[in-house]
Amino acid sequence: MIVRKPPMGWNSWNTFAADINEKLIFETADRMVADGYLDAGYEYLVIDDCWSLRERGEDGRIVPDPEKFPHGMKAVADYVHSKGLKFGMYSCCGSLTCAGFPASYEHEFLDAATFAEWGVDFLKYDNCYKPQEENDPKLYRRMGMALANCGRDILFSACNWGADESHKWIKETGAHMWRSTGDIMDNWASVKSLIEQQKNIWQYNGQGCFNDMDMLIVGMYGKGNVGLGGCSTEEYRTHFSFWSLYGSPLMMGCDIRAVNDECREILLNREVIAVDQDEAYRQPFFLNAMHNDGTVVMCRLLEGGDVAVGFFNLTDSPRRISLTLGDIGINTSSGKALAMRDLWKHEEIGTLTGIYRTPELAPHASMLIRGRIVDR
């Protein structure tokens, strides 16, 4: 199975944690279609931890909790598929999941076969309760082999939180996406920390094995399982801009049944999503090496010759950020310029021929442009 674009979808953990059931999943599937998320590219609906009973069945298989999922997981998968969506589930490389439910250690091939029988299309694979003598590369390779031999295409989302320098070995496991960070929390400090953690590993991002900066918190506003304080709408926009420019998977974590209009517009911004989903999937690169002044300028070369540039003010004070043609790599003697479009305002903002300075960016604000190289 080859995955050419960063996966997009919804995951239950950020908002609901253990408070999941069949009704929630069915309603979320309905809204993913009715509210335009599927059309925008969000195709995976993923149930995270806490979906099973505390003990395996007599046949050794994991048993879905009959109170939460009275019709079983095959019925849930069938409903999700009937909406044109793909269905995802969760397990762990240890003996227990992070919440203490049965996990897949030494049951990898059985669990992969079970997931395939249920119609699972996506597996998030966490990193809790593994034996001390075991190492992450072997355990993730083992599940990678099990999924590759289960008879069904199942996207493998490896979630070991960036431990053991996983960026150096994760591709060998067969993972299609890999968590490079610890868990995100719904506050600005967490978003900023996850951004800063990318400065030394950006070059390991690549098509088919995508650097996952964790699920989106856009629209949570402090509510739910990881809702520790919440963010402002502007901070959510910065969060979404960086994840998209970086090419991270976009997995929504809010309750999409209750998200407000502003955050729905963020999540459904087709121009920003197009940057994340660019078919060339070239690595982004930092133009200012994360300056000590707290600003970040990051660029990504896109299919067809365009470039995307993000300006990020991570400080607590207003900032204006500069960009020159030379920063991008266009020499002044080339006779070329850069026609720029603001992807949040959806408007052309002029042509860069020398130096561009952003409008004043409020604390934690950002600007994302798409540039087209033109003759002067």
What role is predicted for each listed range?
Residues 243-246, 251-253, 290-332:
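Carbohydrate-binding surface patches
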Residues 336-356:
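Solvent-exposed beta-strand/loop surfaces of large extracellular or lumenal domains
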Residues 107, 138, 149, 155-255, ...:
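Glycan-recognition surfaces
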Residues 7-12, 41-47, 86-91, 121-126, ...:
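Structural recognition of the beta-strand scaffold that forms the well-ordered cores
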Residues 238-288:
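Catalytic cores of secreted or luminal carbohydrate-active enzymes
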Residues 352-376:
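C-terminal beta-strand-rich structural cap/linker in extracellular carbohydrate-active enzymes
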Residues 1-23, 31:
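N-terminal module-boundary/linker segments of secreted carbohydrate-active enzymes
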Residues 28-132:
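Aromatic-lined carbohydrate-binding/catalytic grooves of carbohydrate-active enzymes
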